[in-house]
Amino acid sequence: MVRYKATISYDGTLFSGFQRQPNARSIQEEIEKTLLRLNSGIPVTVHGAGRTDAGVHAYGQVIHFDLPQERDPEKLRFGLDTQCPDDIDIVSIELVSEEFHARYSKHIKTYEFLVDAGRPKNPMMRNYAIHYPYPLSLALMQEAAMELVGTHDFTGFTASGTSVENKVRTITQASVSIDEKTGFYVFAFSGNGFLYKQVRNMVGTLLKIGNGRMPVSQAKTVLESRDRNLAGPTVAGNGLYLKEIRYE
C-alpha cells in the first residue's frame, strides 16, 4: 500500500464535524465516498489529524489514506478536489512513508477563533464568527492569554465527561489581536494537542475577562483549580478554524 498525506480546507457550516457518524454529513465520509470512486469501488479509510466539531472550519486540516498503487500526487489531488463537494478543498497531496500518521505523528496545531464585536453585527459572517456585542479590553485579554502558555493540566478548560485521562497539554503560543480589515478579534493558539472544546472554553473565559466580568487572574485560577465551573462559557463552534498543522 502507498500512503498519501493531504492538506485540506473546508467550510464546516453544513457538516456535523470531521468524523464519520451515522445519519449525519461529515468531512471524513465525503472524502471517503470520493476516494471509493477513484479507487475502483474499493473502500479507503481517511485518518484526520484533528476531529473538528459541527460548524468548525479548517484552512489546514491534514489527513492521510492508503491506496494500492502509487499515483501522481497532483493528478490525484485534482481528481479528488474536483469530485469532492464545493465546501471541501484539497489543497495539496504528497507521498509519505508508512510510518506517517496524520493524528499520531508529532505535530503542532494552530487554531484561530474569530469574534465580531461590532454593533450592528455583520449578518454575512454569522457562520464564520461569533457575535459578542459587549465592550472588550484587548489589553486585558492579551495579558490573560499569556497565562495559558506553557505545559499545564487543562482539566478546567475541557468539556465535562471527556474520556481522556491525561489532560496535560503544552501551548506554545496564545495571542489576541484585532484584524484591521474586518475589526474582528482574532484569538490564536498553537500547541501539541487540544482537549475537547478546550479552545472554545478558553475563548469564552478570555471574553469574560475582556468584558470585566472576570479578573485577569481567572485564567490562572482555572488552570490551578482544574475546575470547569470557574471558566467562562463554551462559545459556539462557528468562529473556530483549524489554521495549520506543522509536523516535525
UniProtKB/Swiss-Prot annotation:
Pfam families: PseudoU_synth_1. It catalyses: uridine(38/39/40) in tRNA = pseudouridine(38/39/40) in tRNA. Coiled coil: none annotated. Keywords: Isomerase, tRNA processing. Its EC number is 5.4.99.12. The active site is at residue 53. It comes from the Bacteria. The keyword Cytoplasm does not apply. One of its GO terms (molecular function) is tRNA pseudouridine(38-40) synthase activity. The keyword Methyltransferase does not apply. Substrate binds at residue 111. GO terms for biological process: tRNA pseudouridine synthesis. Belongs to the tRNA pseudouridine synthase TruA family. NCBIfam families: hisT_truA. Formation of pseudouridine at positions 38, 39 and 40 in the anticodon stem and loop of transfer RNAs. Homodimer. This is tRNA pseudouridine synthase A. The lineage of its organism: Bacteria, Bacillati, Bacillota, Bacilli, Lactobacillales. The gene is truA.
